């Protein structure tokens, strides 16, 4: 992920190994990370069991919010790909009990279709 993408607030891919190391304390027994994305300090992680949104807060980033979303709670999602003048892709997730969708932006280098495919399979129960 480049500096320009970081300034714009767009997530880029990160390795499952790095994400596993960073999230070792919150992953369940035998829970495996399948895809991970990083945005400056925040992260978006898809495991074999759930979607995890990590929000590091404050100047030092010591305060961290972990939002765990079971795949069965996702009722719908949309994917918006990059265009000629729109350099970022967007994913919107509608979660049961939430009035508005969770919107996530990704840089143009990120293969948003990998995430879309994994989400579609998980929501379908595969």
Predicted regions and their residues:
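Canonical phosphoinositide-binding patch of PH/PH-like domains
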Residues: 95-114
């Amino acid at each position: 992920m480049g500096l320009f993408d970081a300034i714009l607030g767009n997530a880029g891919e990160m390795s499952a190994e790095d994400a596993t190391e960073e999230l070792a304390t919150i992953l369940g027994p035998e829970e495996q990370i399948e895809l991970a994305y990083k945005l400056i300090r925040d992260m978006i992680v898809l495991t074999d069991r759930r979607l995890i949104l990590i929000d590091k807060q404050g100047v030092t980033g010591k305060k961290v919010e972990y939002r765990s979303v079971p795949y069965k709670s996702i009722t719908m999602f949309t994917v918006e790909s990059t265009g000629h003048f729109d350099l970022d892709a967007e994913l919107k997730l509608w979660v049961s009990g939430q009035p508005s969708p969770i919107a996530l932006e990704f840089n143009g280098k990120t293969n948003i279709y990998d995430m879309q495919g994994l989400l579609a399979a998980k929501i379908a129960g595969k």
